[in-house]
Amino acid sequence: MFERFTDKARQAVVLAQEEARRLGHPEVRTEHLLLGLLAVDGESAATRTLTGLGVPLDDLRAEVEERIGRGEGAPSGHLPFAPQNKKVLELSLREALQLGHNYIGTEHILLGLVREAESGAARLLAARGADLNAVRQEVARQLATGAGDRAAAAKPSKEGLIADIEALYDEIGRLSREVHRLTDLLRRHGIEPDQGTSRSA
């Protein structure tokens, strides 16, 4: 269903929701999506781009978490994406099409974040020298060396990619509901999911 997204791009979007829940926020904002990009397993085109711009990833993560703080607790069930974040994913699609790519990778999500200049994530990145022009140039340099999040897929239509993004929202919701169901199941058996220990132990 999500063949247009690279594995790392899908992982970043799912991790964004996990970051929002971990920090006790009621919706997934651009800062959470940035944290999701930073949390992807191993290197990604996005983290290579930021490193190439001299942005220390651990410092950036700490700054993002400090800026958005902790909420009073995320509601149970699916966490919605903030409208600004939906726009970021739409901009990611446009960046992919503009580059002539038949996939959406973490580099395109990063471009979408910085292109939405009024977002919290974009302001944090711009303060560290990672504005739209700088990121575009570094992404181009990374792609020239074959370092993008490439995926083998037939060239899609714009409508097909938009449909994939909408399907991704649905899948995120399904995964969130499943996590919530399993969490409730563990608690009914006296196990706190965060600690993985029984109350009776």
What are these regions (language model features)?
Residues 1-201:
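Histone-fold recognition with a strong bias for associated Lys/Arg-rich disordered tails
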